[in-house]
Amino acid sequence: MEETEPSFKDILESEQPPEWIPFIVLGSVMTLAILALDVWAFVKHKKYSTKFPLQFFCTFGILQVYPFFSLMALIGMIVPRAHELAEFSAESLECLTFLFFLRLCLTYLGGKKATKSILEGSDMHINVPPLCCLVCLPSVKFSRKFFIFCEFLIYLYTVFRLALGFLELVMLTDAAEEFPHLEKGTHVITGKFSAVCHTLLLVLLFFAVYGLSGIYHTAEELLKNRGIVKKFLVYKIFTLVVKFQSVIFISLIHHDVIGNKKFGFNEIWSADLRVRNCLALAICVEAIFAFPLALKFYNTDDYVPGNVMQEVIELEDTRHDIVANVVADQQPETMDTIKA
């Protein structure tokens, strides 16, 4: 007989609370703590960001990865059959974060148009992470075409990731009671099609990182005081750990290391359910440690006047004033010429 997950109705109608109730309690406490810290950070950043609304939007879009992942993990524990929907929601925000990072770098430089103008003709290296090992690649001049190409790589990964996740969600809905169980595993899309899709996803992720890295390294001198690398690494390490730690839990569950009653699981519940609860609790623990570290890097000093963005704006204003003065000085000479 195939092992199936209990529905939320089954859990409510049961005479006893679910055996993973300690996981739910711990996850709830940590999630509430993260949400409280998120509200505090929102109020603090909002106070200093009145003149930088786009920068504030991008910053908080990135920071929401930690509380949102924790909240979705908690929902997956409370409502087991909603795990796939919660996971899709979390991964959707995660892939959108690439766009937030791109836009954040551009706002530091005064916007997209200012970035293109500032970096036009700058020396840049093609061998940037993750292609940094290819030292034989030559240096080239930054161009608008390269900027558009880097943008395209980031948008392509985002769109493909959302489309693939949505497709899995649709197929899961169609599978209804037949999914999930141990024989089918944790993915609805299986076989060669699954291998092709997820391999392509990894390749697109690789190039999305390359596109973001290409823009950053070209403007590295202007962004050196922004801690962009630290901001990106704390986010990316967190999301990569979340993705790859599931392999560890699956191995532990299927070798019965986590499977007896002393860990709070009865044999009537599926191994897949045990994996998900352990994984969800681990996400909550990791988020509560990673979120304060991220807040340390995304401090309110970014909003203080005198940053790169302000300097670019002031430079543009000065340039326009000079042009206006030159035009004004030339107008009387033109009138005298006409009279003569």
Question: What positions do the PLM features span?
Answer:
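Juxtamembrane membrane-interface segments at transmembrane-helix boundaries in membrane proteins
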Residues: 1-23, 133-149, 179-197, 260-280
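Membrane-proximal first intracellular loop
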Residues: 3-95, 99
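Juxtamembrane interfacial secondary-structure elements that flank transmembrane helices
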Residues: 38-50, 82-85, 101-125, 251-259, ...
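C-terminal transmembrane module of eukaryotic multi-pass membrane proteins
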Residues: 211, 216-330, 340
